[in-house]
């Protein structure tokens, strides 16, 4: 009976020790870095980047993240100084700087006016993901005065 108690206590002690070793071997990821499959996305837009270029005081800035595991692109675009309210916002691809391409997705206008915001999430196809990661996606904001686009910005990614 005493032998049974010794083995039982030794068994439970080994389980507790194993658990303690497991927990102590885990490393807390508190360095602020994103996962290996998450990329920061950004892009500044101006009329000079449109093709052909347009004269406007409007500008825009895109920021967000792209997760290559889920193919989800979370974005926020803020613009100021447009000639009027935005009529449409799109991502376009495949295109390098200065080259035009067709729209690949419409973006939601959250707050509209000469100053405004577009915020949302889009799911990219594998082909669109390749365009994004190779710097071949741009966004542009259309207005009544500039139906083909008043400001344009190339989207760049960086893995963190």
In which residue ranges do the predicted regions lie?
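Short, exposed beta-strand-loop hairpins at the edges of beta-sheets
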Residues: 129-131, 137-154
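Transition segment at domain starts
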Residues: 32-68
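Acidic glycine-/aspartate-rich tracts in secreted/extracellular proteins
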Residues: 81-83, 94-99, 144-146
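Bacterial Sec-dependent N-terminal signal peptides
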Residues: 2-3, 18-42
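Aromatic sugar-binding surface patches on proteins
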Residues: 71, 114-123
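Bacterial N-terminal signal peptides that target proteins for export
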Residues: 2-13
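Divalent metal-coordination and catalytic microenvironments
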Residues: 62, 89-93, 139-141
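Solvent-exposed serine/threonine-rich low-complexity stretches and specific carbohydrate-binding patches
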Residues: 104-112
């Amino acid at each position: 009976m005493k032998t049974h108690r010794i083995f039982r206590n030794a068994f439970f002690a080994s389980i507790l020790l194993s658990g303690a070793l497991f927990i102590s071997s885990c490393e807390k990821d508190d360095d602020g870095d994103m996962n290996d499959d998450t990329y920061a996305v950004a892009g500044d837009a101006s009329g000079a980047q449109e093709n052909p270029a347009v004269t406007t005081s409007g500008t825009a800035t895109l920021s967000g993240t792209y997760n290559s595991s889920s193919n989800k692109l979370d974005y926020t675009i803020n613009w100021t100084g447009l000639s009027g309210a935005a009529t449409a916002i799109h991502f376009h691809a495949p295109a390098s700087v200065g080259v035009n391409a067709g729209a690949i997705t419409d973006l939601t206008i959250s707050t509209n006016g000469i100053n405004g915001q577009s915020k949302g999430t889009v799911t990219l196809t594998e082909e669109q993901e390749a365009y994004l990661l190779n710097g071949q996606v741009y966004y542009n904001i259309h207005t009544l005065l500039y139906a083909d686009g008043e400001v344009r910005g190339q989207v760049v990614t960086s893995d963190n």
